[in-house]
């Protein structure tokens, strides 16, 4: 059931993350909110990571709801289905972790673009470009907008679970560091 539906669910998760990131930063750039927030006694990097935390929590809620729906469908249409909570939690955790680089990169893109439509366009182009790439190529499947399409069952089957978790964790940290550096450079030119 998961393998038949995950591609569409992953695409919806990514599109919702893109829209959320674009709207978060659009509200800051509208009416010069970014300049007003720069005088607050809080670092802009802290605000960015707060936004990332909000986006990660929303993503987690979406994945948990999707897993609950899949379990409900499996129980209804496949009476012989045996509910295994640990397997469902592992799958949900894996899906959240491999999607976090996409969320972080989209927040970085949205913070760099004052026009919401530019960042939204970049995000949508990346989604559809990387969704058509072959998912069996390990290098291409590790790109931020391609990794959410990976499933735990396929990663376990190919012994790539640790690779996906490590690379996605590293990508998330690198994009966070890149945003902090970008904020310092942007502050110099304002």
Task: Label each residue range with its predicted role.
Residues 25, 34, 69, 73, ...:
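Hydrophobic alpha-helical interface/terminus motif in multipass membrane transporters
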Residues 1, 120-190:
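Terminal transmembrane helical anchor/hairpin motif
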Residues 24-56:
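Helix-loop-helix units of permease transmembrane domains in multi-pass membrane transporters
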Residues 1-17, 49-113, 153-167:
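Secretory targeting signals
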Residues 101-131:
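Functionally important transmembrane alpha-helices
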Residues 1-32, 133-135, 178:
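Transmembrane helix-boundary elements of multi-pass transport/secretion proteins
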Residues 32, 67, 71-83, 114-115, ...:
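Transmembrane helix-loop junctions in multipass membrane proteins, especially transporters and channels
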Residues 21, 62, 66, 70-74, ...:
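Structural signal for membrane-spanning alpha-helices in multi-pass inner-membrane proteins
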């Amino acid at each position: 059931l998961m393998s038949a539906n995950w591609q569409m669910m992953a695409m919806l998760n990514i599109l919702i993350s893109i829209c959320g990131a674009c709207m978060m930063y659009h509200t800051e750039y509208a009416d010069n909110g970014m300049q007003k927030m720069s005088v607050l006694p809080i670092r802009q990097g802290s605000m960015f990571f707060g936004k990332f935390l909000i986006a990660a929590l929303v993503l987690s809620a979406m994945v948990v709801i999707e897993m609950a729906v899949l379990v409900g469908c499996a129980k209804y249409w496949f009476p012989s289905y045996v509910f295994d909570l640990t397997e469902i939690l592992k799958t949900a955790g894996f899906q959240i972790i491999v999607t976090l680089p996409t969320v972080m990169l989209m927040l970085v893109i949205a913070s760099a673009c004052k026009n919401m439509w530019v960042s939204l366009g970049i995000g949508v182009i990346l989604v559809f470009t990387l969704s058509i790439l072959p998912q069996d190529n390990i290098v291409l499947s590790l790109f931020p907008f391609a990794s959410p399409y990976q499933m735990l069952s396929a990663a376990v089957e190919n012994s790539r679970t640790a690779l996906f978790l490590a690379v996605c964790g590293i990508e998330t940290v690198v994009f966070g560091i890149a945003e902090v550096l970008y904020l310092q450079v942007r502050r110099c030119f304002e």
